[in-house]
């Protein structure tokens, strides 16, 4: 992909920098904190954290675009590879794998940013365990835990931490650590998905209680998955992996939920709106994004859209079919993924780390259990039905009965035996 626009920080006023920082976001908490930092003419320090659990998918393009905006606005950006968080989240990443997954995430994120033309030299990557096991951090965790209730901690992580029937204590520690990261990374703002809102609120309400300043919080919308609902790394039917091949991308898109005329909850349209258009804007000198649908001539020929609103209007009015929309997304997405796939194929370290981070599952063949009671039982081991005596169940020894040659003889002998 072509490099991004050449607008520099010095070309932007504080107001323009604020508009760029907050563009395409769903919500901003405490925007005045951001404005006051920009008014001081100093760079806004912001961090985005990601827990290295499942393989990163195409939904990661959404925060990557915002990182590009932050950098262009002159922000100092930190990417937190939250390895301890990955372990705390109901053991989504076992300890023996989490280090490899953190490295894999770093390689993938850098490749994605290069693919959309973002200079990565100004990014700072930090591994959570590099400071979260220190004495000062642990003591701050104790202090924070002394003022946050179990109810509030559980509520904060409800949309982020995996919910199970018997919640683990680790799920309550998770949101407290995410709040503390703001202080220990020395930032002015934290960025994340809107699903992080309750954790952001917990941080804003409780950090001042242990003597730390309140931060601003920036939230991007959550892109619906291909099957509807949230795009998730744990649901293979909801997402396209960043290293999926062209045929896999085509297959997943063709199977995706994309009802004619329906815009709300349509994962394919949302992907165009929140990924393809913003990336196209990054690459254009004038910041104007375009999305091309390669339609057959008999259906009107190729059509170019300059905005998501324009595309949605045509889709609602059935001027754009689901199949044509999917073809356009397939073509644009494969162009985005090509340099990422090439990075992987040409980098032996990348391949090795991927193997270590996500080892192939070994299927263990289950042994058939021997059915009890079907084998031969020696004569001296035979027992009759169990007999209850004084509340204690005792097996009776088997009694052999010669039943004779007639029904009358058998009944008489059985009656005598029972006496």
Question: Where are the regions a protein language model picked out?
Answer:
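Divalent-metal (Mg2+/Mn2+/Ca2+)-assisted nucleotide/phosphate chemistry catalytic cores
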Residues: 89, 94-219
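Conserved nucleotide- and phosphate/pyrophosphate-binding catalytic cores
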Residues: 179, 185, 197-419
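An acidic- and aromatic-residue-enriched active-site/binding cleft used to recognize and process polar
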Residues: 51, 82-84, 128-130, 194-196, ...
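Positively charged, low-complexity intrinsically disordered leader regions
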Residues: 2-46
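N-terminal catalytic cores of NTP/NDP-binding nucleotidyl/phosphoryl-transfer enzymes
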Residues: 27-90, 189-203
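Divalent metal-coordination and catalytic microenvironments
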Residues: 57, 109, 228
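Short secondary-structure boundary/capping segments
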Residues: 63, 93-97, 142, 235, ...
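Short acidic-hydrophobic, aromatic-tinged amphipathic segments that line or gate anion-handling sites
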Residues: 25-29, 126, 240-242
């Amino acid at each position: 992909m072509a490099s991004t626009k050449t607008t520099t920080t010095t070309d932007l006023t504080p107001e323009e920098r604020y508009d760029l920082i907050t563009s395409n976001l769903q919500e901003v908490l405490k925007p005045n904190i951001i404005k006051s930092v920009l008014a001081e003419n100093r760079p806004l320090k912001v961090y985005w954290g990601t827990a290295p659990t499942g393989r990163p998918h195409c939904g990661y393009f959404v925060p990557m675009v915002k990182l590009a905006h932050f950098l262009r606005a002159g922000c100092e950006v930190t990417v937190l590879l939250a390895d301890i968080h990955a372990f705390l989240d109901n053991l989504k990443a076992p300890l023996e794998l989490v280090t490899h997954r953190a490295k894999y995430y770093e390689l993938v994120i850098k490749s994605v940013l290069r693919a959309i033309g973002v200079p990565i030299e100004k990014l700072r990557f930090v591994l959570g365990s590099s400071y979260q096991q220190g004495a000062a951090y642990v003591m701050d965790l104790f202090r924070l835990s002394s003022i946050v209730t179990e109810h509030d901690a559980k509520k904060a992580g409800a949309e982020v931490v995996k919910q199970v029937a018997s919640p683990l204590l680790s799920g309550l520690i998770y949101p407290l650590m995410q709040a503390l990261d703001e202080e220990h990374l020395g930032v002015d703002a934290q960025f994340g998905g809107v699903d992080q809102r309750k954790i952001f609120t917990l941080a804003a309400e409780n950090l001042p209680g242990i003597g730390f300043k309140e931060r601003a919080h920036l939230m991007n919308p959550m892109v619906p998955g291909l099957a509807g609902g949230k795009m998730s790394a744990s649901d293979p039917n909801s997402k396209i992996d960043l290293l999926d091949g062209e045929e896999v991308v085509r297959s997943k898109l063709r199977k995706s939920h994309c009802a004619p005329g329906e815009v709300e909850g349509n994962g394919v349209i949302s992907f165009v709106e929140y990924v393809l258009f913003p990336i196209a804007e990054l690459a254009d000198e004038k910041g104007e994004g375009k999305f091309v649908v390669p339609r057959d001539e008999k259906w009107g020929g190729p059509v170019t859209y300059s905005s998501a609103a324009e595309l949605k209007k045509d889709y609602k009015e059935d001027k754009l079919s689901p199949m044509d929309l999917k073809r356009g997304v397939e073509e644009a997405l494969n162009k985005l993924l090509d340099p990422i796939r090439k990075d992987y194929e040409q980098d032996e370290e990348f391949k090795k780390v991927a193997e270590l981070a996500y080892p192939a599952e070994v299927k263990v063949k289950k042994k058939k259990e021997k059915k009890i009671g079907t084998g031969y039982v020696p004569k001296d081991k035979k027992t009759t039905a169990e007999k209850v005596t004084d509340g204690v169940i005792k097996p009776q020894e088997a009694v052999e009965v010669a039943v004779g040659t007639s029904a009358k003889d058998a009944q008489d002998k059985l009656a005598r035996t029972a006496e």
